[in-house]
Amino acid sequence: MYGIEYTTVLTFLISVILLNYVLKSLTRIMDFIIYRFLLIIVILSPLLNAQNYGINLPITGSMDTPYTNSTREEVFLTSTLCLYYPTEAATEINDNSWKDTLSQLFLTKGWPTGSVYFKDYTDIASFSVDPQMYCDYNLVLMKYDATLQLDMSELADLLLNEWLCNPMDITLYYYQQTDEANKWISMGSSCTIKVCPLNTQTLGIGCLTTDTNTFEEVATAEKLVITDVVDGVNHKLNVTTNTCTIRNCKKLGPRENVAVIQVGGSDVLDITADPTTMPQTERMMRVNWKKWWQVFYTIVDYVNQIVQAMSKRSRSLNSAAFYYRV
Protein backbone atom coordinates (compact mmCIF):
# COMPACT_ATOMS: atom_id res chain seq x y z
CA MET A 1 0.00 0.00 0.00
CA TYR A 2 2.81 2.33 0.90
CA GLY A 3 4.44 1.57 -2.45
CA ILE A 4 1.34 2.65 -4.34
CA GLU A 5 1.13 5.91 -2.35
CA TYR A 6 4.79 6.67 -2.96
CA THR A 7 4.29 6.01 -6.67
CA THR A 8 1.29 8.35 -6.80
CA VAL A 9 3.14 11.13 -5.01
CA LEU A 10 6.17 10.66 -7.22
CA THR A 11 4.02 10.77 -10.35
CA PHE A 12 2.37 13.97 -9.16
CA LEU A 13 5.71 15.63 -8.44
CA ILE A 14 7.08 14.63 -11.83
CA SER A 15 3.95 16.06 -13.52
CA VAL A 16 4.36 19.36 -11.66
CA ILE A 17 8.02 19.56 -12.67
CA LEU A 18 7.20 18.82 -16.32
CA LEU A 19 4.38 21.38 -16.36
CA ASN A 20 6.67 23.99 -14.86
CA TYR A 21 9.31 23.20 -17.49
CA VAL A 22 6.76 23.49 -20.31
CA LEU A 23 5.45 26.83 -19.03
CA LYS A 24 8.97 28.22 -18.71
CA SER A 25 9.75 27.05 -22.24
CA LEU A 26 6.64 28.72 -23.62
CA THR A 27 7.51 31.92 -21.75
CA ARG A 28 11.01 31.95 -23.20
CA ILE A 29 9.63 31.37 -26.72
CA MET A 30 7.09 34.21 -26.38
CA ASP A 31 9.76 36.53 -25.02
CA PHE A 32 11.97 35.65 -27.95
CA ILE A 33 9.18 36.41 -30.46
CA ILE A 34 8.15 39.68 -28.81
CA TYR A 35 11.69 40.99 -28.42
CA ARG A 36 12.57 40.11 -32.00
CA PHE A 37 9.37 41.80 -33.25
CA LEU A 38 10.15 44.97 -31.31
CA LEU A 39 13.72 44.91 -32.59
CA ILE A 40 12.48 44.72 -36.20
CA ILE A 41 10.13 47.68 -35.60
CA VAL A 42 12.95 49.75 -34.10
CA ILE A 43 15.24 48.96 -37.03
CA LEU A 44 12.60 49.77 -39.69
CA SER A 45 11.01 52.81 -38.01
CA PRO A 46 13.43 55.35 -39.57
CA LEU A 47 12.42 54.03 -42.98
CA LEU A 48 8.66 54.39 -42.41
CA ASN A 49 6.48 57.54 -42.58
CA ALA A 50 4.01 57.73 -39.72
CA GLN A 51 2.03 60.59 -41.25
CA ASN A 52 0.60 61.56 -44.58
CA TYR A 53 2.57 64.60 -45.74
CA GLY A 54 0.10 65.46 -48.49
CA ILE A 55 0.49 65.44 -52.23
CA ASN A 56 3.93 65.32 -53.78
CA LEU A 57 3.69 68.49 -55.86
CA PRO A 58 6.16 69.16 -58.66
CA ILE A 59 8.41 72.21 -58.55
CA THR A 60 6.12 73.94 -61.03
CA GLY A 61 3.17 73.67 -58.61
CA SER A 62 1.77 76.48 -56.50
CA MET A 63 3.96 77.46 -53.59
CA ASP A 64 1.27 79.76 -52.24
CA THR A 65 -1.07 76.98 -51.18
CA PRO A 66 -0.60 75.87 -47.55
CA TYR A 67 -0.52 72.12 -46.96
CA THR A 68 -1.05 70.84 -43.47
CA ASN A 69 1.05 67.99 -42.13
CA SER A 70 -1.81 65.73 -41.11
CA THR A 71 -2.96 62.15 -41.17
CA ARG A 72 -6.36 63.40 -42.39
CA GLU A 73 -7.16 62.27 -45.93
CA GLU A 74 -7.21 65.19 -48.37
CA VAL A 75 -10.80 65.88 -49.38
CA PHE A 76 -10.04 66.34 -53.06
CA LEU A 77 -8.84 62.75 -53.41
CA THR A 78 -12.40 61.48 -53.06
CA SER A 79 -14.42 64.51 -54.19
CA THR A 80 -15.74 65.99 -57.42
CA LEU A 81 -15.13 69.52 -58.65
CA CYS A 82 -17.29 71.40 -61.16
CA LEU A 83 -15.88 74.42 -62.97
CA TYR A 84 -18.48 76.69 -64.61
CA TYR A 85 -17.23 79.12 -67.26
CA PRO A 86 -18.72 81.32 -70.03
CA THR A 87 -18.66 79.88 -73.55
CA GLU A 88 -16.50 82.78 -74.70
CA ALA A 89 -13.61 81.13 -72.85
CA ALA A 90 -13.69 78.04 -75.07
CA THR A 91 -14.14 80.23 -78.14
CA GLU A 92 -11.06 82.28 -77.33
CA ILE A 93 -8.91 79.26 -76.44
CA ASN A 94 -9.95 77.51 -79.67
CA ASP A 95 -8.37 74.17 -78.75
CA ASN A 96 -10.30 70.90 -78.84
CA SER A 97 -8.06 69.35 -76.18
CA TRP A 98 -7.93 72.25 -73.74
CA LYS A 99 -10.06 70.42 -71.16
CA ASP A 100 -7.71 67.43 -71.27
CA THR A 101 -4.80 69.79 -70.71
CA LEU A 102 -6.47 71.31 -67.67
CA SER A 103 -7.37 67.87 -66.33
CA GLN A 104 -3.70 66.92 -66.40
CA LEU A 105 -2.81 70.15 -64.63
CA PHE A 106 -5.45 69.54 -61.95
CA LEU A 107 -3.89 66.10 -61.51
CA THR A 108 -0.65 67.78 -60.37
CA LYS A 109 -2.68 69.39 -57.59
CA GLY A 110 -4.10 66.09 -56.36
CA TRP A 111 -7.37 65.99 -58.32
CA PRO A 112 -7.57 62.61 -60.10
CA THR A 113 -8.51 62.47 -63.76
CA GLY A 114 -12.29 62.26 -64.01
CA SER A 115 -12.95 64.15 -60.77
CA VAL A 116 -13.01 67.60 -62.42
CA TYR A 117 -15.95 68.54 -64.67
CA PHE A 118 -16.08 71.52 -67.03
CA LYS A 119 -19.50 73.09 -67.64
CA ASP A 120 -20.11 76.11 -69.85
CA TYR A 121 -22.91 78.67 -69.86
CA THR A 122 -23.87 81.26 -72.46
CA ASP A 123 -24.16 84.29 -70.21
CA ILE A 124 -24.98 85.36 -66.67
CA ALA A 125 -28.66 85.88 -67.45
CA SER A 126 -29.23 82.42 -68.92
CA PHE A 127 -27.17 80.74 -66.21
CA SER A 128 -29.25 82.38 -63.49
CA VAL A 129 -32.45 80.89 -64.92
CA ASP A 130 -31.29 77.29 -64.63
CA PRO A 131 -28.32 76.88 -62.27
CA GLN A 132 -27.35 73.23 -61.86
CA MET A 133 -24.69 72.31 -59.33
CA TYR A 134 -24.22 68.68 -58.45
CA CYS A 135 -20.52 68.40 -57.57
CA ASP A 136 -19.04 68.27 -54.08
CA TYR A 137 -17.32 71.57 -54.85
CA ASN A 138 -18.53 74.12 -57.42
CA LEU A 139 -16.48 77.03 -58.77
CA VAL A 140 -18.35 79.60 -60.86
CA LEU A 141 -16.29 81.93 -63.07
CA MET A 142 -18.10 85.19 -63.87
CA LYS A 143 -16.39 87.67 -66.16
CA TYR A 144 -16.93 91.19 -64.91
CA ASP A 145 -19.25 93.38 -66.94
CA ALA A 146 -20.05 96.87 -65.69
CA THR A 147 -23.50 96.70 -67.28
CA LEU A 148 -24.32 93.45 -65.45
CA GLN A 149 -23.18 94.26 -61.92
CA LEU A 150 -26.68 93.84 -60.50
CA ASP A 151 -27.22 90.50 -62.25
CA MET A 152 -23.84 89.24 -61.07
CA SER A 153 -24.52 90.33 -57.51
CA GLU A 154 -27.97 88.71 -57.41
CA LEU A 155 -26.68 85.50 -58.99
CA ALA A 156 -23.89 85.36 -56.41
CA ASP A 157 -26.43 85.88 -53.63
CA LEU A 158 -28.53 83.03 -55.05
CA LEU A 159 -25.64 80.60 -55.47
CA LEU A 160 -23.76 81.34 -52.26
CA ASN A 161 -26.75 80.89 -49.97
CA GLU A 162 -29.41 78.27 -49.28
CA TRP A 163 -33.02 79.34 -49.67
CA LEU A 164 -36.31 77.86 -48.49
CA CYS A 165 -38.96 78.81 -51.07
CA ASN A 166 -42.70 78.41 -51.54
CA PRO A 167 -44.97 79.23 -54.52
CA MET A 168 -46.87 82.53 -54.56
CA ASP A 169 -50.37 83.04 -55.96
CA ILE A 170 -50.30 86.77 -56.63
CA THR A 171 -53.73 86.77 -58.27
CA LEU A 172 -55.51 85.80 -55.04
CA TYR A 173 -53.34 86.94 -52.16
CA TYR A 174 -51.39 89.87 -50.81
CA TYR A 175 -47.91 89.16 -49.52
CA GLN A 176 -45.55 90.72 -47.03
CA GLN A 177 -41.94 90.09 -46.09
CA THR A 178 -41.50 89.23 -42.43
CA ASP A 179 -37.82 90.10 -41.96
CA GLU A 180 -34.58 90.87 -43.79
CA ALA A 181 -33.99 87.21 -44.65
CA ASN A 182 -37.35 87.05 -46.45
CA LYS A 183 -37.10 87.87 -50.19
CA TRP A 184 -39.15 87.29 -53.32
CA ILE A 185 -37.08 85.60 -56.00
CA SER A 186 -38.18 85.58 -59.62
CA MET A 187 -36.75 83.52 -62.49
CA GLY A 188 -37.68 83.37 -66.13
CA SER A 189 -36.91 84.55 -69.63
CA SER A 190 -38.26 88.03 -68.82
CA CYS A 191 -39.32 89.20 -65.36
CA THR A 192 -40.96 92.57 -64.81
CA ILE A 193 -41.97 93.07 -61.19
CA LYS A 194 -44.35 95.76 -59.93
CA VAL A 195 -45.51 96.23 -56.33
CA CYS A 196 -48.18 98.24 -54.58
CA PRO A 197 -47.79 98.63 -50.78
CA LEU A 198 -51.06 98.51 -48.80
CA ASN A 199 -52.22 100.14 -45.60
CA THR A 200 -54.19 98.41 -42.87
CA GLN A 201 -57.40 98.94 -44.86
CA THR A 202 -55.77 97.19 -47.87
CA LEU A 203 -55.81 100.45 -49.81
CA GLY A 204 -52.81 101.25 -51.96
CA ILE A 205 -50.14 103.56 -50.56
CA GLY A 206 -49.33 105.85 -53.49
CA CYS A 207 -50.96 103.46 -55.94
CA LEU A 208 -54.32 102.01 -56.95
CA THR A 209 -54.78 98.28 -56.44
CA THR A 210 -57.02 98.19 -59.51
CA ASP A 211 -54.53 99.90 -61.83
CA THR A 212 -51.18 98.18 -62.32
CA ASN A 213 -49.88 101.22 -64.17
CA THR A 214 -49.72 103.00 -60.79
CA PHE A 215 -47.68 100.20 -59.20
CA GLU A 216 -44.01 100.78 -58.39
CA GLU A 217 -41.78 98.96 -60.88
CA VAL A 218 -38.80 97.34 -59.12
CA ALA A 219 -37.48 95.21 -62.02
CA THR A 220 -37.81 95.36 -65.78
CA ALA A 221 -37.31 92.45 -68.20
CA GLU A 222 -34.73 90.67 -66.03
CA LYS A 223 -34.05 86.94 -65.86
CA LEU A 224 -33.25 86.83 -62.16
CA VAL A 225 -34.73 89.22 -59.61
CA ILE A 226 -34.34 89.20 -55.83
CA THR A 227 -36.99 91.65 -54.62
CA ASP A 228 -36.73 93.32 -51.22
CA VAL A 229 -39.60 95.48 -49.94
CA VAL A 230 -40.52 97.06 -46.60
CA ASP A 231 -40.97 94.36 -43.97
CA GLY A 232 -44.33 93.90 -42.29
CA VAL A 233 -46.30 95.68 -45.02
CA ASN A 234 -48.73 93.86 -47.30
CA HIS A 235 -48.10 94.25 -51.03
CA LYS A 236 -50.10 93.51 -54.12
CA LEU A 237 -47.83 92.28 -56.90
CA ASN A 238 -47.94 92.34 -60.66
CA VAL A 239 -45.56 89.93 -62.40
CA THR A 240 -45.20 88.83 -66.02
CA THR A 241 -46.26 85.31 -65.05
CA ASN A 242 -46.27 84.04 -68.63
CA THR A 243 -42.48 84.42 -68.78
CA CYS A 244 -41.55 84.47 -65.11
CA THR A 245 -42.11 82.52 -61.89
CA ILE A 246 -41.95 84.17 -58.47
CA ARG A 247 -41.37 82.45 -55.13
CA ASN A 248 -41.52 83.56 -51.51
CA CYS A 249 -38.09 82.67 -50.11
CA LYS A 250 -36.25 82.67 -46.81
CA LYS A 251 -32.46 82.81 -46.68
CA LEU A 252 -31.31 79.96 -44.45
CA GLY A 253 -27.56 80.44 -44.49
CA PRO A 254 -24.44 80.00 -46.60
CA ARG A 255 -24.13 77.27 -49.25
CA GLU A 256 -20.58 76.34 -48.41
CA ASN A 257 -19.77 74.10 -51.37
CA VAL A 258 -19.99 76.97 -53.89
CA ALA A 259 -17.45 79.69 -54.64
CA VAL A 260 -17.90 82.55 -57.11
CA ILE A 261 -14.78 83.87 -58.82
CA GLN A 262 -15.01 87.26 -60.46
CA VAL A 263 -12.82 87.45 -63.54
CA GLY A 264 -11.41 90.92 -64.16
CA GLY A 265 -12.89 94.30 -63.32
CA SER A 266 -11.53 97.15 -61.26
CA ASP A 267 -14.27 96.75 -58.66
CA VAL A 268 -14.85 93.62 -56.63
CA LEU A 269 -18.48 92.65 -56.15
CA ASP A 270 -19.31 92.43 -52.47
CA ILE A 271 -22.56 90.97 -51.18
CA THR A 272 -21.41 90.79 -47.55
CA ALA A 273 -22.90 94.22 -46.88
CA ASP A 274 -26.34 92.60 -47.04
CA PRO A 275 -27.53 92.33 -43.40
CA THR A 276 -28.91 88.86 -44.17
CA THR A 277 -25.44 87.56 -45.02
CA MET A 278 -24.20 85.78 -41.93
CA PRO A 279 -21.38 85.45 -41.23
CA GLN A 280 -20.01 88.51 -43.00
CA THR A 281 -17.60 86.47 -45.10
CA GLU A 282 -18.33 84.87 -48.43
CA ARG A 283 -16.58 82.56 -50.84
CA MET A 284 -16.34 85.27 -53.49
CA MET A 285 -12.96 86.03 -55.02
CA ARG A 286 -11.41 87.95 -57.89
CA VAL A 287 -8.66 87.10 -60.38
CA ASN A 288 -7.07 89.33 -63.01
CA TRP A 289 -8.05 88.83 -66.62
CA LYS A 290 -5.93 89.13 -69.73
CA LYS A 291 -6.53 85.85 -71.51
CA TRP A 292 -8.68 82.89 -70.51
CA TRP A 293 -5.69 80.55 -70.47
CA GLN A 294 -4.17 82.78 -67.80
CA VAL A 295 -7.40 82.65 -65.81
CA PHE A 296 -7.54 78.85 -65.86
CA TYR A 297 -3.86 78.57 -64.95
CA THR A 298 -4.53 80.77 -61.92
CA ILE A 299 -7.53 78.67 -60.90
CA VAL A 300 -5.51 75.46 -61.13
CA ASP A 301 -2.69 77.00 -59.12
CA TYR A 302 -4.98 78.09 -56.29
CA VAL A 303 -7.68 75.42 -56.45
CA ASN A 304 -6.72 73.74 -53.18
CA GLN A 305 -6.53 77.06 -51.36
CA ILE A 306 -9.99 77.93 -52.67
CA VAL A 307 -11.43 74.56 -51.66
CA GLN A 308 -10.05 74.96 -48.15
CA ALA A 309 -12.35 77.98 -47.76
CA MET A 310 -15.34 75.78 -48.65
CA SER A 311 -17.12 72.81 -47.10
CA LYS A 312 -18.16 69.64 -48.87
CA ARG A 313 -21.93 69.41 -49.03
CA SER A 314 -24.25 66.78 -50.51
CA ARG A 315 -27.20 69.05 -51.32
CA SER A 316 -27.39 69.92 -55.01
CA LEU A 317 -28.86 72.98 -56.67
CA ASN A 318 -31.04 73.18 -59.72
CA SER A 319 -33.85 75.48 -60.75
CA ALA A 320 -36.60 72.98 -59.89
CA ALA A 321 -35.31 72.21 -56.40
CA PHE A 322 -34.61 75.90 -55.81
CA TYR A 323 -38.28 76.75 -55.91
CA TYR A 324 -38.96 74.70 -52.82
CA ARG A 325 -35.73 74.20 -50.99
CA VAL A 326 -32.09 74.49 -51.89
From Swiss-Prot:
Disulfide bonds: C82-C135, C165-C249, C191-C244, C196-C207
Organism: Rotavirus A (strain RVA/Human/United States/P/1974/G3P1A[8]) (RV-A)
UniProt keyword list: Calcium, Capsid protein, Disulfide bond, Glycoprotein, Host endoplasmic reticulum, Host-virus interaction, Metal-binding, Outer capsid protein, Signal, T=13 icosahedral capsid protein, Virion
Cell location: Virion; Host endoplasmic reticulum lumen
Sites where the protein binds Ca(2+) 1: D95, G206, T214, E216
InterPro entries the record matches: VP7 (IPR001963), VP7_1 (IPR042207), VP7_2 (IPR042210)
Residues annotated as signal peptide: 1-50
Glycosylation sites: N69, N238
Highest taxon listed in the record's lineage: Viruses
A GO term, aspect molecular function: metal ion binding
Cellular component annotations (GO), alphabetically ordered: host cell endoplasmic reticulum lumen; T=13 icosahedral viral capsid; viral outer capsid
Protein name listed in UniProt: Outer capsid glycoprotein VP7
Family in the record: Belongs to the rotavirus VP7 family.
Note: Some rotavirus strains are neuraminidase-sensitive and require sialic acid to attach to the cell surface. Some rotavirus strains are integrin-dependent. Some rotavirus strains depend on ganglioside for their entry into the host cell. Hsp70 also seems to be involved in the entry of some strains. In group A rotaviruses, VP7 defines the G serotype.
Region (GPR motif), start-end ranges: 253-255
Region (CNP motif): 165-167
Pfam families listed in its UniProt record: VP7
PTM summary: N-glycosylated.
Function: Calcium-binding protein that interacts with rotavirus cell receptors once the initial attachment by VP4 has been achieved. Rotavirus attachment and entry into the host cell probably involves multiple sequential contacts between the outer capsid proteins VP4 and VP7, and the cell receptors. Following entry into the host cell, low intracellular or intravesicular Ca(2+) concentration probably causes the calcium-stabilized VP7 trimers to dissociate from the virion. This step is probably necessary for the membrane-disrupting entry step and the release of VP4, which is locked onto the virion by VP7.
